[in-house]
Amino acid sequence: MSYHKSSGTTLMVPLFMLLISVNYFMSCNAQLSTTFYDTTCPTALSTIRTSIRSSVSSNRRNAALVIRLLFHDCFVQGCDASLLLSGAGSERASPANDGVLGYEVIDAAKAAVERVCPGVVSCADILAVAARDASVAVGGPSWTVRLGRRDSTTSNAAQAATDLPRGNMVLSQLISNFANKGLNTREMVALSGSHTLGQARCIRFRGRIYNSTLRIEPNFNRSLSQACPPTGNDATLRPLDLVTPNSFDNNYYRNLVTSRGLLISDQVLFNADSTDSIVTEYVNNPATFAADFAAAMVKMSEIGVVTGTSGIVRTLCGNPS
């Protein structure tokens, strides 16, 4: 295709659209504030914290589930609690979110907040705060959460299929996927560190055993093969972090250095490529990882937020009203 003399005009249109997008993003984020509920619901944060602490205390796996919920929500349609909506055609019903759990943890936190401040605090804000509190509950970093998100009334299963990263992605695909959400390579590696918590099913890591040329430690490979044969046992769970799966630390990266990453998308972060140096830095400097993770979570939690008079404040997080 040739633009000839019209190419100048053609180039200006995307630039104009880019400026609109940047200004819109900045405008939405500018409406977020750490003091958003100080007068309308001053006990909101303490109520959420108490609820999340209780949930994680009863089952430490809940910390991983909550952090994953925020990630999956923000990567599809922005951080608007659209993932929490139930029903046919919703993100929640998408095969891309098959295996995503923990909705009841957020429902419990929402119910607790509704009892003290009915109709005030959005599910999107509760999810953002809950992820921070879940991290702290298992020894992870804390960060400041700016508030004022509103809840969307729509949810898109098809978009979940295209926007969420997959466990079999290679490094270039991961970098591109995160870049599409405004997150750079270092932030991608830091956020992948959330895999210091939680588990994955055999159906998600089978490719790492049988369909990958990535290095894999022999004993680790043997253990995975026994738990996850070429067919069957799809629901068998294995920890993403072999050493301390219920504590937030940097052992996830130590596993990668010894070729014991559970998913393909884990091990590609340390595979004689551009991100090896970041992984090594996080192995040697856990405080750097914690700081980078916290900063990346702040940035991710403000992707595509709905603010002001847009959206709603749902009474029930699974119901679009």
From Swiss-Prot:
List the GO biological process terms.
hydrogen peroxide catabolic process; response to oxidative stress
Q: What class of enzyme is it?
A: oxidoreductase
* Residues carrying covalently attached carbohydrate according to the record: 211, 221
Task: State the disulfide connectivity.
Answer: 41-117, 74-79, 123-317, 202-228
Keywords from the named record? Calcium, Disulfide bond, Glycoprotein, Heme, Hydrogen peroxide, Iron, Metal-binding, Oxidoreductase, Peroxidase, Pyrrolidone carboxylic acid, Secreted, Signal
Signal sequence interval, chain numbering:
1-30
Which CDD domains does the record associate with it?
secretory_peroxidase
> E.C. number, please?
1.11.1.7
PTM comment text: N-glycosylated.
Record: residues binding Ca(2+) 1: 73, 76, 78, 80, 82
The UniProt annotation places substrate binding at 165
Positions that bind Ca(2+) 2: 196, 241, 244, 249
Q: Which reaction does it catalyse?
A: 2 a phenolic donor + H2O2 = 2 a phenolic radical donor + 2 H2O
- Main localization of the protein described in the UniProt heading: secreted
Domain of life, per UniProt, equals Eukaryota
Q: Which Pfam families match?
A: peroxidase
Question: What does UniProt list as catalytic?
Answer: 72 (proton acceptor)
Role this protein plays: Removal of H(2)O(2), oxidation of toxic reductants, biosynthesis and degradation of lignin, suberization, auxin catabolism, response to environmental stresses such as wounding, pathogen attack and oxidative stress. These functions might be dependent on each isozyme/isoform in each plant tissue. Involved in the synthesis of highly polymerized lignins.
Entry's family note: Belongs to the peroxidase family. Classical plant (class III) peroxidase subfamily.
What's the protein name? Basic peroxidase
Q: Give the source species.
A: Zinnia elegans
